[in-house]
Swiss-Prot record:
Keywords: Nucleus, Ribosome biogenesis, rRNA processing. Pfam families: SLX9. Involved in ribosome biogenesis. Required for normal pre-rRNA processing in internal transcribed spacer 1 (ITS1). Belongs to the SLX9 family. The keyword Cell inner membrane does not apply. GO terms for cellular component: 90S preribosome; nucleolus; nucleus; preribosome, small subunit precursor. It comes from Schizosaccharomyces pombe (strain 972 / ATCC 24843). One of its GO terms (biological process) is maturation of SSU-rRNA from tricistronic rRNA transcript (SSU-rRNA, 5.8S rRNA, LSU-rRNA). Residues 12-47, 65-75 have a biased composition (Polar residues). GO terms for molecular function: snoRNA binding. It is found in: Nucleus, Nucleolus. This is Ribosome biogenesis protein slx9.
Length: 172
């Protein structure tokens, strides 16, 4: 299937709007012009006809409309100055309100610090080499076997663990 031919002018666009018979109708070919008015140039007819408005004309119109937004100020200069002055005054910080809040913040911080539990240093993960991990494992196994062989643990294990925890937590 061949490519569709690209339209290169607005005239071809206008021809596509013709009635299905292919012939322009009587109303489409004759513009609405009063008999008493005289046309001074062909450019006026082209500018009034939306089908023949060029891309350049459209761009000029769009640019003109865009410029009109800035040429008509919406507010007077005194109102603009008044608004700017109020905005500057609202930016000033009231330090007295901060001074009233500071004691409450200090109290909250001290309460939060007192609630923090001390971190047990042994529970922190530290980087260990393979050999130190192996040595610690062997020491832990020996310590656990010594506890299991202890006579107080053999007689009453729960009481011994409770006593050990009480002694170790009091020292910390």
């Amino acid at each position: 299937m061949p490519k569709a031919k690209k339209r290169v002018s607005l005239a071809s666009k206008a021809s596509s709007r013709l009635p299905s018979s292919g012939k322009p109708s009587q109303q489409a070919s004759i513009p609405n012009v009063e008999l008493s008015s005289t046309v001074t140039s062909n450019s006026q007819v082209l500018n009034n006809d939306p089908l023949k408005e060029t891309k350049k004309d459209k761009r000029k119109d769009r640019h003109f409309n865009w410029q009109q937004k800035f040429s008509n100020p919406k507010i007077s200069a005194s109102a603009r100055k008044r608004r700017n002055r109020k905005a500057r005054e609202n930016l000033k910080v009231n330090v007295s309100s901060i001074g009233e809040v500071l004691p409450e913040i200090d109290l909250d911080i001290s309460v939060a610090n007192s609630r923090l539990k001390p971190v047990i240093k042994d529970s922190l993960s530290s980087k260990q080499t393979k050999s130190s991990m192996k040595r610690n494992t062997v020491e832990e196994i020996e310590r656990f076997q010594a506890i299991l062989k202890h006579p107080s643990f053999v007689s009453n294990p729960l009481e011994t663990v409770r006593e050990h925890l009480g002694n170790s937590l009091d020292s910390r």
